[in-house]
């Protein structure tokens, strides 16, 4: 299950998110690996990227399940975005638990011809009960690709557009593509589970 939403986030909130994520005060962390630290296949390709854990992560790992939650000073961006989603769509989030929210910035890849990251799901257990929201914070290229369960057949390519977001089931394999025409691709990734 996936659904793409356009024109549901007000210009005011979309501009606020973009401006904040691209502000010099918003600190990014270097990410050498897209998904996992160990690379099971030497042919596997990880996009070098920058990220900022907004809630629920420590050292790149979710800590919500440990009974602890960390929130960055930028958690208000998640609250603003979710408020807009609740107000302007029929998406029901009240019975969901927020597991993780992070922002990611990708740059053009000059190292390899490969433009897609590792195909992955965001968490390893109970995927069918989880949902993901991927919000595009700026105008750019660098599609998100959703795959069928065989992890070979493309289900949908989603092009970034400022203010667009895609809601999809946690069991859908997916990957990001680095931009080739734009200087940066900025997203917020929000993961929910059942309460």
Language-model segments: which ranges?
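Catalytic core of non-heme Fe(II) oxygenases with the double-stranded beta-helix
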Residues: 64-195
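Non-heme Fe(II)/2-oxoglutarate
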Residues: 1-94
């Amino acid at each position: 299950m996936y659904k793409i939403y356009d024109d549901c986030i007000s210009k005011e909130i979309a501009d606020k998110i973009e401006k904040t994520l691209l502000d010099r005060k918003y600190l990014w962390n270097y990410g050498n690996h897209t998904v996992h630290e160990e690379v099971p296949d030497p042919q596997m390709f990880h996009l070098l990227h920058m990220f900022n854990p907004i809630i629920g992560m420590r050292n790149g790992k979710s800590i919500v399940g440990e009974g602890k939650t960390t929130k960055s000073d930028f958690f208000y961006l998640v609250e603003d975005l979710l408020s807009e989603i609740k107000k302007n769509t029929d998406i029901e989030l009240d019975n969901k638990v927020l597991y993780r929210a992070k922002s990611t910035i990708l740059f053009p890849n000059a190292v390899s011809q490969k433009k897609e990251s590792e195909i992955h799901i965001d968490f390893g257990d109970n995927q069918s009960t989880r949902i993901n929201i991927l919000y595009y914070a700026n105008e750019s290229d660098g599609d998100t690709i959703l795959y069928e369960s065989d992890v070979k057949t493309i289900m949908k390519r989603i092009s970034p557009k400022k203010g667009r977001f895609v809601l999809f089931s946690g069991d859908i394999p997916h990957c990001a593509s680095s931009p080739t025409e734009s200087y940066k691709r900025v997203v917020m990734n929000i993961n929910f589970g059942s309460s």
